[in-house]
């Protein structure tokens, strides 16, 4: 179908009793605007409405393009009297001319703008090459020639495709735009073409991935960009990592971003053919080639909702050995594993609707496995890990409630392990002088009361926890540092492909697990800088730098170092000089200097 801009003055080519032929910008129309021509217009509307969408017929207003009408001569055989004879005679003559002209162009492989619908009639299988080089496969539903004030004429092409924007596989439409053109151009220069065998294979392979990942709650790996379109532009995020496909939660939690995503992608639902594909069959293999190239969900890496390209999706390569390498006592590991794996299979509460969640409180010095425990058990059980920092929850009561409620909701829907790291601000005992923080703690307590999922809370300040949390916490585990260093060094050295026997020599350095990981990365960088293999001396150098920094921070801020533990004595010149200076000052003070 076509739409035209009639702002330019028409040129009358020929006038008949019942209609007249006009030309606008080189294109011919049958004009029925004059009151004496209204009878023919009524015939057009009546007969065309039987064959076409009434909305498409209304687009023509009083002027019908001759190039369109010549394909519907059979409909006008029923028009009475002289009007019919004149109209059919004119259209047949025009069709003869157009067929001859079109045949001549076709032999040369050329097309005019008016040929597009003839070359690609409704029902034609096509592929469309988008401006970024990506291919869309589909079946032509309709073509409209539109007019833009900014860009001039363009074709709006509606393709019948397979999508899952509502969380179920559906027939739908994918709208693409093709620039208009003047004169004759090679058919091969158009981004719209009939698919080759290679096109079909490429699109079918992508469609298989669509069939694998479309279902809401699917957890997969992703390499590529997350896109959040807006009216004028698009926000993009490098989202390498793991994602959860969930268009339903996306639409509920971020309706504006969701709406922009769908509109910019040109996806719409075919309400007449909705749900024709049976859910138990999922998608027929013959339809793989016309599955849309995007899915919608949440990136756990950048913590954003948006659109993902299917080409970047893959199955997760699980690190099942992460649990075995976790340096935590056997009893604690068994408790965590059992409660997470069989969560939700026991007694919940007498009051319906109250939470049956499992809440862990992991406390102890930094760097000794609290965060790693949540990560490792999620990896072992192949569940999503949704890690949240306090800063993501907002600083006001309203923001906290909305954000935390959304997070808890999707964590349950995805059967995810939820980790709220360094949750001290929400766990600390309430203070009658700090009303704002008291309100936030109250919101936090209430939402935990009704949470049905698995939640890990970590803190370094267990002694300051508000007593109201005691009954909300299912299990509290204390993470100690004593006797773990050698095992942590051994595991991390092995994971990095280094000699695990180095652990014996490195264990005396008083560093935690997180610092050990950083030291190994720093040591590898030092070795690469010298273009040689890493040596134990590189690790010692890295560890010494870490300890020097920590020592200086403790001496500068003694109040902040109360819970940090003793520092391993190492040959670090700067800290020793500082201690000596302080000792002399203290001695002078005692002598009354």
Predicted regions and their residues:
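Short, polar/charged, Gly/Pro-enriched helix-capping and turn/loop motifs at alpha-helix termini
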Residues: 418, 458, 499, 530-534, ...
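Hydrophobic face of alpha-helices
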Residues: 88, 333, 441, 517-520
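Conserved AAA+ ATPase small/helical "lid" subdomain
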Residues: 477, 496-547
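AAA+ P-loop NTPase nucleotide-binding core of proteostasis motors
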Residues: 468, 477, 552, 556-561
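Intrinsically disordered, polybasic Lys/Arg-rich low-complexity tracts
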Residues: 576-588
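C-terminal domain-closing interface element
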Residues: 428-431, 566-576
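AAA+ P-loop ATPase mechanoenzymes
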Residues: 1-347, 357, 394, 530, ...
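Walker A/P-loop NTP-binding motif of AAA+ ATPase domains
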Residues: 322, 326-507, 590-593
């Amino acid at each position: 179908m076509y739409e035209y801009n009639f702002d330019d003055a028409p040129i009358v080519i020929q006038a008949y009793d019942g209609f007249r032929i006009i030309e606008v910008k080189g294109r011919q129309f049958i004009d029925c605007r004059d009151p004496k021509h209204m009878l023919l217009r009524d015939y057009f509307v009546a007969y065309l409405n039987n064959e076409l969408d009434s909305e498409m017929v209304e687009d023509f207003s009083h002027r019908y393009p001759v190039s369109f009408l010549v394909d519907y001569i059979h409909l006008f055989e029923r028009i009475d009297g002289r009007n019919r004879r004149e109209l059919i005679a004119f259209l047949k003559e025009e069709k003869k001319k157009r067929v001859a002209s079109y045949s001549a162009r076709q032999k040369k492989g050329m097309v005019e703008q008016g040929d597009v619908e003839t070359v690609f009639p409704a029902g034609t299988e096509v592929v469309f090459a988008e401006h970024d080089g990506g291919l869309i496969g589909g079946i032509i539903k309709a073509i409209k020639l539109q007019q833009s004030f900014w860009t001039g004429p363009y074709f709006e092409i509606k393709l019948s495709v397979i999508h899952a924007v509502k969380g179920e596989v559906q027939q739908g439409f994918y709208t693409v735009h093709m620039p208009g053109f003047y004169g004759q151009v090679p058919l091969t220069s158009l981004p719209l073409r009939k698919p080759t065998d290679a096109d079909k294979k490429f699109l079918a392979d992508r469609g298989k991935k669509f069939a694998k990942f479309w279902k809401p709650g699917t957890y997969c790996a992703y390499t590529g960009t997350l896109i959040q379109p807006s009216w004028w532009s698009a926000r993009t995020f490098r989202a390498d990592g793991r994602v959860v496909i969930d268009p339903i939660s996306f639409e509920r939690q971020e309706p504006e971003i969701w709406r922009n995503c769908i509109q910019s992608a040109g996806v719409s639902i075919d309400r007449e053919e909705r749900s024709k594909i049976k859910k138990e069959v999922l998608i027929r293999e013959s339809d793989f080639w016309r599955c849309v190239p995007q899915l919608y969900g949440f990136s756990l890496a950048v913590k954003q909702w948006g659109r993902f390209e299917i080409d970047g999706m893959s199955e997760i390569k699980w690190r099942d050995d992460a649990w075995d390498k976790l340096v935590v006592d056997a009893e604690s590991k068994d408790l965590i594993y059992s409660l997470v794996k069989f969560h939700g299979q026991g007694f919940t509460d007498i009051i319906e609707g109250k939470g049956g969640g499992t809440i862990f409180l992991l406390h102890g010095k930094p760097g000794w496995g609290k965060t790693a425990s949540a990560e490792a058990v999620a990896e072992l059980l192949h569940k999503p890990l949704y890690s949240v920092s306090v800063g993501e929850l907002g600083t006001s009561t309203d923001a906290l409630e909305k954000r935390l409620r959304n997070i808890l909701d999707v964590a349950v829907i995805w059967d995810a392990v939820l980790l709220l790291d360094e949750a001290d601000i929400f766990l600390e005992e309430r203070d009658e002088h700090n009303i704002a923080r008291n309100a936030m703690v109250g919101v936090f307590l209430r939402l935990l009361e009704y949470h049905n999922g698995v939640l890990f809370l970590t803190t370094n300040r267990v002694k300051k926890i508000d007593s109201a949390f005691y009954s909300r916490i299912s299990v509290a585990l204390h993470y100690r540092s004593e006797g773990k260093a050698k095992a942590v060094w051994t595991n991390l050295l092995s994971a990095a492909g280094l000699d695990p026997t180095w652990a014996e020599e490195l264990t005396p350095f008083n560093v935690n697990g997180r610092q050990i990981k950083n030291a190994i990365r720093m040591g590898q960088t030092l070795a690469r800088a010298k273009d040689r293999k890493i040596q134990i001396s590189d690790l010692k150098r890295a560890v010494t730098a870490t300890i020097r920094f920590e020592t200086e921070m403790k001496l500068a801020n003694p109040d902040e170092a109360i819970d940090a533990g003793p520092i391993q004595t190492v040959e670090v010149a700067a800290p020793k000089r500082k201690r000596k200076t302080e000792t002399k000052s203290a001695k002078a003070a005692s002598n009354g200097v």
